[in-house]
A protein has these predicted regions:
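Long, charge-dense
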Residues: 50-73
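Structural motif
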Residues: 24-27, 45-47, 69-80, 111, ...
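Alpha-helical scaffold segments in soluble metabolic enzymes
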Residues: 12-19, 57, 61-65, 99-103, ...
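Long, hydrophobic N-terminal alpha-helical segment
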Residues: 1-51
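Glycine-rich, aromatic-bearing surface loops/beta-hairpins
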Residues: 81-151
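Intrinsically disordered, low-complexity coil segments
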Residues: 39-44, 70-74, 85-92
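Conserved active-site and cofactor/substrate-binding residues in soluble primary-metabolism enzymes
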Residues: 4, 8-12, 21, 53-57, ...
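Short, low-complexity, polar/charged sequence segments that are solvent-exposed and flexible
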Residues: 46-48, 66-67, 149-151
Length: 151
């Protein structure tokens, strides 16, 4: 047991967060994300699966532990953009995004979520350090985080 470490974060996640370096990318994925396929190509090489939690819960647990690259990256936190067909249908901004903003703003009050086109998001995820797939069932629930420096 450790003090001040959220209990929902298993040791494997803590090790990954610690091993990541400045500029490395972490993907917090929803339940529909092709996690096993993409995770094979990441630095970590395998999927971490946390099906009992959603992305907001995991983000809330790591936000005070994981520095974001606000100094050198325009958007150190990015969501997968709506597809053109979903925009054409008039789909509103996904509810998950406001949740992510609210959680991130606890540590980073001026943060703005970036957006990445769906297939570009998948390509960036393949180059990530690690993919953590959750039980997130809200649409467009994927989140990309760029690690910064501990100062």
């Amino acid at each position: 047991m450790l003090n001040n470490i959220p209990k929902i974060l298993p040791g494997e996640v803590l090790k990954v967060l610690c091993d990541m370096g400045h500029g490395d990318v972490l993907i917090l994925a929803d339940a529909n994300f092709p996690g096993n396929t993409i995770a094979k190509e990441t630095t970590y090489g395998k999927l971490i699966n946390l099906p009992g939690n959603d992305v907001s819960e995991i983000l809330d647990a790591i936000v005070s532990l994981f520095p974001l690259d606000t100094a050198y990256t325009e958007f150190p936190a990015c969501v997968m953009e709506l597809t053109d067909s979903d925009k054409a249908k008039g789909m509103p901004e996904p509810e998950a995004w406001s949740s992510y903003r609210s959680i991130l703003q606890k540590e980073y009050p001026d943060i703005t979520l970036g957006g990445i086109e769906r297939f570009e998001f998948y390509e960036k995820a393949k180059k990530a350090y690690c993919v953590i797939e959750t039980g997130e069932d809200r649409v467009y629930g994927n989140l990309l985080l760029v690690k910064g420096c501990v100062l």
